[in-house]
Amino acid sequence: MAVFLCPPNKELSLTGSTFHVHPKSTPLGWPRSITLLLKSLAAAVGNRVIAVILSGMGADGSAALMAVKASGGRILVQSGAPYGSMPRYAIETGLVDRILTPSQIAADLVNCCKLIDRQTV
């Protein structure tokens, strides 16, 4: 398992095994940084993607959930988010696997990693 952090005012995508850092695009409306990243992850790593949608504004990420689901990935969404529009839009897609508190999301990710480790041994 790996965790990657995006630099401020940038966007990330993955092609093959290489992350690419892009200048932040600013189309009309809300940015689509999470949508770009999730679509590229689904294409690059398939069923190993776990999309986690946390508190946030707008619908960023929701447009990519079909790609995550089609690749066999999992989708987790934060319940009780202080800024709930990103989780709400994700839930409205009908593609979400689990709606959890942040601590439950952390535990679920740990369990997923343990399962992956067992499968790769």
Positions of PLM-derived features:
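Conserved acid/base catalytic micro-environments in cytosolic active-site loops
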Residues: M1-V121
